[in-house]
């Protein structure tokens, strides 16, 4: 039930005046009538009526009218007569006249005379033969509907078309065809009607009291503010929904991850998306017959199909590691390593190749991370995409060990807001290796969210690195699915404005 007194107190003074205008009236009112009775301007009436309509107290009905008026030429025709009328008047007492002489007597120029002759014949008032014009009858033709309409418009200035009788509407059609005589424009009409709810407010009693729009220093100093009337605030009023520009949620998480690693003292690095198999696979001690290299798992680039290998010393060291284990003490993979296979161009399948490049170019101690897109020939499903983002990182130094790695990962996941645990795992290029699992309290379950380990000697020695190196990797889309409670990974790349607008602007992200 409405609190009528509270609502009335919250109304603007102009809204009250619009309602007061309906006292003693059950009919809709024009804005002009309200403005005149309440001594306010039309603009204020319309503004207040719009506010009242939004709350259901009045209805603003809109209608459009077409209004016809005379142009400057039309006024001339109304005063002096249409060209055909002036021609027929000039023919009075004459059996016939040559066209130029008739035009001169009628006071018409060549163009006006041509128009007049056409209408003279169309109305059946005259005829033309061998350049001579004559009247059909000795009697002066009666004024037509078009002439009566011109006279009416000259007298009244403008007329609503819907108010014209049918005869004059037909004449208006003819005058519209004679360009430049009449002007037709649309005007909007508004009427305002009081609703049942508005009538309840009016019957409750509305008092018009001037409101204070601001409290000045003088009001405060003199105490006059205590006697001023203030309009109440409507804290229940509906507010407009605002859809500001927002950063995409995936970009927000990437920025959050970047921020965490930068605060932990890491350096950011990037690498090419089109990579050689050498950096993507061989450098990481992945054999050339490994299943991950198959066409069904990796995108091979057609152009350029091959890339240059790095310096010969590095290539030879990687070859030795694969074939015999080199100087690492390992037996390697015991096969004949092929340079042509290593030169093949691929879309990188992980960002670990960035770590390999970084280690080959920089001396430990170091801490590096990289965020970028990776590509795998995955069938698109609710949890797999052929293109996604990955964050990769390494820590290298004499004192770096597996326990340091676990500590860094624990701190990283803590900053993301997750409890983490570690389970033993296997990866081709790390040993010891672990999988990171985070706990989801709402599901009371653990979910795998990344892998990590210590780079094997077969990876490090060819790169010339003599210190231990800890490495880790994480799929960012999977993290986004958990963070935003998404069941289908494809949602991250669909233009679902409803979902995007519903996400919080800030809050759980450390930006």
From Swiss-Prot:
InterPro entries: aa-tRNA-synth_II, aa-tRNA-synth_II/BPL/LPL, Phe-tRNA-synth_IIc_asu, Phe_tRNA_ligase_alpha_bac/arc, Phenylalanyl-tRNA_Synthase, WH-like_DNA-bd_sf, WH_DNA-bd_sf. It is an enzyme of class 6 (ligase). One of its GO terms (cellular component) is cytoplasm. CDD domains: PheRS_alpha_core. Its main location: cytoplasm. Its cofactor is Mg(2+). L-phenylalanine binds at residues 352, 390-392, 429, 455. One of its GO terms (biological process) is phenylalanyl-tRNA aminoacylation. One of its GO terms (molecular function) is magnesium ion binding. Gene3D superfamilies: Bira Bifunctional Protein, Domain 2, Winged helix-like DNA-binding domain superfamily/Winged helix DNA-binding domain. Coiled coil: none annotated. It comes from the Archaea. It is found in: Cytoplasm. It catalyses: tRNA(Phe) + L-phenylalanine + ATP = L-phenylalanyl-tRNA(Phe) + AMP + diphosphate + H(+). Its EC number is 6.1.1.20. Belongs to the class-II aminoacyl-tRNA synthetase family. Phe-tRNA synthetase alpha subunit type 2 subfamily. Tetramer of two alpha and two beta subunits. This is Phenylalanine--tRNA ligase alpha subunit. It comes from Methanothermobacter thermautotrophicus (strain ATCC 29096 / DSM 1053 / JCM 10044 / NBRC 100330 / Delta H) (Methanobacterium thermoautotrophicum).
């Amino acid at each position: 039930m409405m609190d009528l007194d509270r609502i009335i107190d919250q109304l603007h003074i102009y809204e009250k005046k619009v309602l007061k205008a309906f006292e003693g009236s059950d009919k809709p009112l024009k804005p002009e009538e309200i403005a005149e009775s309440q001594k306010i301007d039309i603009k204020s009436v319309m503004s207040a009526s719009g506010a009242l309509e939004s709350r259901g107290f009045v209805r603003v009905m809109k209608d459009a009218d077409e209004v016809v008026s005379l142009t400057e030429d039309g006024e001339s025709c109304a005063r002096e007569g249409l060209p055909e009328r002036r021609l027929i008047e000039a023919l009075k007492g004459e059996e016939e006249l040559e066209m130029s002489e008739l035009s001169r007597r009628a006071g018409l120029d060549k163009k006006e005379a041509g128009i007049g002759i056409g209408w003279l014949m169309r109305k059946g008032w005259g005829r033309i033969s061998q350049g001579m014009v004559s009247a059909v009858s000795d009697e002066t033709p009666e004024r037509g509907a078009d002439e009566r309409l011109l006279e009416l418009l000259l007298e009244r200035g403008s007329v609503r078309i819907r108010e014209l009788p049918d005869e004059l509407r037909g004449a208006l059609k003819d005058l519209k065809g004679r360009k430049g005589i009449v002007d037709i424009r649309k005007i909007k009409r508004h009427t305002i009607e009081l609703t049942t709810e508005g009538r309840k407010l009016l019957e409750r009693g509305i008092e018009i009291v001037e409101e204070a729009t601001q409290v000045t220093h003088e009001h405060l100093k003199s105490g006059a503010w205590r006697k001023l009337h203030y309009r109440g605030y409507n804290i229940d009023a509906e507010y407009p929904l605002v859809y500001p520009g927002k950063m995409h949620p995936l970009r927000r998480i990437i920025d959050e991850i970047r921020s965490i690693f930068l605060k932990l003292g890491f350096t950011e690095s990037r690498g090419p998306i089109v990579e050689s198999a050498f950096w993507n696979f061989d450098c990481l001690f992945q054999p050339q017959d490994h299943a991950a290299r198959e066409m069904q798992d990796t995108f091979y680039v057609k152009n350029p199909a091959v890339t240059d290998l790095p310096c010969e010393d590095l290539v030879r060291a990687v070859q030795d590691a694969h074939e015999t284990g080199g100087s690492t003490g390992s037996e390697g993979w015991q096969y004949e390593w092929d340079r042509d296979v290593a030169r093949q161009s691929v879309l990188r399948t992980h960002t670990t190749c960035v770590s390999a490049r970084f280690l080959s170019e920089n001396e430990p101690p170091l801490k590096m991370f990289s965020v970028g897109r990776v590509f795998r020939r995955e069938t698109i499903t609710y949890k797999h995409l052929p293109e996604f983002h990955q964050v990769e990182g390494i820590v290298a130094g004499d004192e770096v060990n597996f326990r340091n790695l676990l500590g860094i990962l624990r701190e990283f996941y803590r900053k993301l807001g997750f409890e983490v645990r570690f389970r033993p795992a296997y990866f081709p290029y790390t040993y010891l290796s672990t999988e990171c699992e985070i706990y989801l309290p709402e599901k009371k379950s653990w979910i795998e969210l990344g892998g990590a380990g210590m780079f094997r000697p077969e990876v490090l020695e060819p790169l010339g690195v003599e210190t231990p190196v800890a490495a880790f990797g994480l799929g960012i889309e999977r993290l986004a699915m958990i963070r935003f409670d998404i069941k289908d990974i494809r949602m991250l790349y669909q233009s679902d404005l409803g979902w995007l607008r519903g996400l919080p602007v800030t809050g759980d992200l450390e930006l």
